[in-house]
Amino acid sequence: GIVNTNTKVTIDGKTFLHRVYGGGFGDPFSTGNNETGKIGGNTEVYIQGANIYGDVFGGGAGVAPKDINGTYTYFTNVAKVSGTTKVEISGEAKIYGNVYGGGDIANIKSYITLTGSAKEAYYNTKPKSESKLDQTTGKFLSYEAKDYTTFVNITGGDIFGEVFGGGKGLMKADAPDYQKVGRINGNTLV
């Protein structure tokens, strides 16, 4: 199916033996590009006190390109997130895998070609993050992030893998145009 708006996943105190996704799950039996598992808005994943024995993704689970009679089909819209993704690891969370701001061979936003002033404005807009602390006690007061496409925020927990602002893509040997899936069409903030 398709979610037209936003998704939010919160895990606190449970054990998962598989991967966690903020986005949708693509149909692995697809033979043509479609919108199965597409999220029309933003995704948020909050892991506060869980044991996760797998990878964590802000985006969805896409479908690898298929060679059908000598022609590759790329599933660029399958499990795509149209908005932004946010992954936050905090508290006593234990992640026994990798953390990705993006998806698993699934795109975040659409690829567009910019020219002129639109291109200049895009490249001049950088992701920003700001923590506010009490100047007297050093106590954490608030945190704000903006102008990002994918955002990974780690305020606690233990991660026994790697952390990526982007997604998990393909190797060059997997398909001639391997770069078409697993893209972050924007910027990342970790």
Q: Which residue stretches match the model-derived regions?
A:
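Surface-exposed loop/turn motifs in large extracellular/passenger domains
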Residues: G1-R19, G24-D55, A61-V190
